[in-house]
Amino acid sequence: MKENAYEMPWRTNYEAMAAAGWLVGATGAIAAEMLSELPPEPFWWMTGISSGMALYRLPEAYRLYKLQKGLKGKPLAFMELSHLQKVMAKHPDELWLGYGFEWDQRHAQRAYEILKRDKQTLLNQGHGKQMGSTWIHGVEPKEEDVYLPVGHTEGHTLIVGTTGAGKTRCFDAMITQAILRNEAVIIIDPKGDKELKDNAQRACIAAGSPERFVYFHPGFPEHSVRLNPLRNFNRGTEIASRIAALIPSETGADPFKAFGQMALNNIVQGLLLTSQRPDLKTLRRFLEGGPEGLVVKAVTAWGEQVYPNFSVEIKRFTEKANTLAKQAMAMLLFYYERIQPVAANTDLEGLLSMFEHDRTHYSKMVASLMPVLNMLTSSELGPLLSPIANDVDDSRLITDSGRIINNAQVAYIGLDSLTDAMVGSAIGSLLLSDLTAVAGDRYNYGVENRPVNIFIDEAAEVVNDPFIQLLNKGRGDRKSTRLNS
C-alpha cells in the first residue's frame, strides 16, 4: 500500500459485484448470439469487452474477499515437533514465536477503520466464533514466521490473556525450543497442566536426553522427585526470611511475624554452628519440641572450637544433669561463665536466649508460624520437601534449584494449587526464593552461567519479594523468565 493511497477494505465488495455484473453481461451476450439470427460479431465484441472488465475487477475483488474473510478468524495452527526442529536448525539464534506479521501503518489504519464500525457485522462469524480478538490476525492476510533473537529474551517476557486464549500453548513452543537448545528449564505450574508436562518430557526425548526431565507434584508423590527448597542460600538469615514471608500478616510491623522470624533464625544459626543443613522438618522439630537438644550440640561445637579443655571442664557442669533440659541449662551456664568472656558468639547467644524464654509466651508468639511449617511437613510433603539423602527406604531422586541449573535439567514443578491453594502458593514462593539464592551465587562466583529459562504459569499465585529481585537482576546471570497471567 502506497504512502498516500486511500484504502477502505471493510466496505461492501463493490468490485465483486461489478465483476459479477460483467460476467452476467458476457454470458447474456453469448446466449443472445446463440438464440438469435443476428450477425455474431457484435455479440463477440460484447463478450470480449465484458470478460475483460470482469477480469480487471476480479483481482481487487478477491483481495478484498480474502482480507474480510480473515477478520472472521483462522483455524488453529498445528506443528509437528520434527518440523520445529527443522525451523530451529535454520534459525539457531532465534526464538520461533508463531505466525504473524510486522505491524505497520496500513495495519494501524485497518484496525482504526474496524474499531469505528459496528464490529459484529464483520467479526467472529466463522470457525466456531473463537474467543478473543481474532480480527487482529485478519488485518494482514499474508502471515509469515515470526522470530525473536534469543538474546532479547533475557529481558524477561510477560504473556497475558484470558482463560483458554492459548497462553500455555505459547509456553509449550518456548519450552520446547529451550530444551532443544540444551538449556536448563524450570516450569512452575500452579494448576498442573498435564499436557504442558507431557510436551516438556516429549521434547527431552526428542533432544536425545530423556534423563534430563524431572517431575515434582505434591499430588503424585510416588512419581515425584524429592526437592529441597531450602538447599541454596548465601546467609542463614535468608532461610528465616523465606519462611517468615509465608506467615499471614495484616500489617507491615506484625510482632508475631517478627518473633517467628527471629525464632527461625536462631534455630538456623544453631544448626549451621553444628554443621547441619537446615530443612523444614528439622526447623519444625526444634520450634515445636524445644531447642534443648540443639543447645547442647551448639555449645559443644563452639566450645570445642574456641575453649581449651572444653571436654574436661564441661563434665563438672553436666555430671548431675540427668535430663536433656538440665543438660541444656548446664551448657548455657558454662557458656556464660567460661566461654563468653573468651570468645562470645552472638548467633549462639540468640539460641540460648530463645531457650531461656518463657515457654508459654514463646508458644503464643510462634502460633502463626507453626501452621505454615505443619502444612509443609505433614504427610507425603515431609519427605518430598525435606529429603534425607541416606534414606535407604526412599529411592526417589533428590534435586534442588542449583542441581537443576548446573546439570541443565528440565524440571516440571506442579504446585497442585487447585487442591490446596495455600500449600501450592507456599511451595512456589519457597522455590522462587531458592532460585534467587542461586542467582546470587552465579553473580558472585560465575558458575558456568549457562542460560536458564524459568516459566511460571499463573504467576500471581507465587510471586514474592525475592522473585521481584530476581526479575530486576536476573539478566546478569543469564536467567530468562516468562510469566503467564
Please give the residue ranges for each predicted region:
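P-loop NTPase motor domains
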Residues: 140-142, 150-155, 160-163, 168-479
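Conserved small/polar residues in nucleotide/adenosyl-binding loops
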Residues: 481-484
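Accessory regions of macromolecular translocation/handling assemblies
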Residues: 1-187, 194-210, 273, 316, ...
